[in-house]
Amino acid sequence: AMASSLLSGWGGPTTLLVAPM
Protein backbone atom coordinates (compact mmCIF):
# COMPACT_ATOMS: atom_id res chain seq x y z
CA ALA A 1 0.00 0.00 0.00
CA MET A 2 2.68 2.48 1.01
CA ALA A 3 5.00 1.40 -1.79
CA SER A 4 2.24 1.73 -4.37
CA SER A 5 1.58 5.29 -3.22
CA LEU A 6 5.25 6.23 -3.63
CA LEU A 7 5.50 4.50 -7.01
CA SER A 8 2.32 6.20 -8.22
CA GLY A 9 4.16 9.50 -7.80
CA TRP A 10 6.47 8.69 -10.73
CA GLY A 11 5.03 5.47 -12.13
CA GLY A 12 1.29 5.87 -12.61
CA PRO A 13 0.47 2.70 -14.56
CA THR A 14 3.09 0.96 -12.42
CA THR A 15 0.75 1.37 -9.45
CA LEU A 16 -1.59 -1.16 -11.06
CA LEU A 17 1.24 -3.71 -11.05
CA VAL A 18 2.24 -2.94 -7.46
CA ALA A 19 -1.33 -2.79 -6.16
CA PRO A 20 -1.61 -6.61 -5.70
CA MET A 21 1.66 -6.47 -3.75
Curated annotation (Swiss-Prot):
Name listed for the protein in its UniProt record: Putative NADH dehydrogenase subunit PS9
Q: What is the lineage of its organism?
A: Eukaryota, Viridiplantae, Streptophyta, Embryophyta, Tracheophyta
Q: Any other noteworthy remark?
A: On the 2D-gel the determined pI of this protein is: 7.1, its MW is: 22.1 kDa.
Source species, domain of life? Eukaryota
